[in-house]
A protein has these predicted regions:
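Cationic, low-complexity basic patches in intrinsically disordered or flexible, solvent-exposed regions
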Residues: 8
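The feature represents the first ordered module of a protein
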Residues: 45, 55-144
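Aromatic (phenylalanine/tyrosine) cluster motif
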Residues: 20, 35, 39, 46-47
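Amphipathic protein-protein interaction modules
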Residues: 118-183
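Acidic, proline/glycine-rich low-complexity IDRs
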Residues: 166-206
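Short hydrophobic alpha-helical segments enriched in small aliphatic residues
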Residues: 16-18, 25, 36
Length: 206
């Protein structure tokens, strides 16, 4: 789980060399194999009826994108043909050099989930801690504005013994949400999503 945390906090520089074929949907369909089905529009979206293999998708990177609440000067996207994730910026496009309008890309936007989704993880963690005094302090820390900052301070500064447990809960839930998002977009099948959820339950809390 520590490796997962490091993966999710990797800097934007890892995406600077990402390049995706600038292929229109019409051109792609014209070159499609017999196994390719028609696309159905939704959002940016053109979603293939055939599914991606979840094992080839960077679930942790999608989780990072879903949690990214920063701004709209950069956006995360996924290629529905390959499952590869890319970072687009308004100044440097996808390749870090050439600006391109995001609407011109045959990629699917990964919009961040609302902050209350991630807030619930903190609340559940505080509620699940066995030591009642520690649990109360954590619960108090997530009340009102500044909850994320106060909770982080409580865990990292005052209860470092809980850091690994917090990372474990936070990361596994983030990964499950990433898989649920892929399912909602029609990129993976229900069986794969259900199996992932079964294989990645919430960890026990101290």
């Amino acid at each position: 789980m520590e490796a997962a945390s490091a993966q999710r906090s990797t800097s934007d520089s890892r995406h600077e060399d990402a390049r995706y074929p600038r292929l229109s949907v019409a051109s792609w369909l014209a070159a499609a194999t017999p196994f390719t089905r028609s696309f159905q529009g939704a959002g940016l979206g053109f979603y293939p009826e055939w599914m991606l293999d979840l094992r080839g998708i960077d679930v942790e990177e999608i989780a990072t994108a879903l949690e990214d609440q920063t701004d709209y000067e950069h956006r995360w996207l996924i290629d529905p043909r390959t499952g590869q994730v890319a970072l687009w910026t308004s100044d440097t496009g996808l390749d870090g050099k050439n600006p391109v309008e995001i609407d011109e890309l045959d990629l699917i936007l990964i919009d961040p989930l609302p902050s209350y989704v991630w807030y619930q993880d903190m609340a559940d963690f505080a509620d699940g801690i066995s030591d009642s005094a520690t649990g109360r302090r954590l619960t108090q820390s997530v009340q009102g504005r500044g909850a994320f900052r106060r909770f982080k301070n409580q865990v990292y500064e005052h209860h470092p013994e809980l850091i690994s447990a917090w990372h474990a809960l936070r990361d596994v839930r983030a990964q499950r949400r990433a898989v649920e998002w892929l399912l909602d977009q029609g990129l993976i099948d229900d069986g794969a999503a259900q199996q992932f959820a079964t294989d990645h339950p919430d960890p026990g809390l101290p």
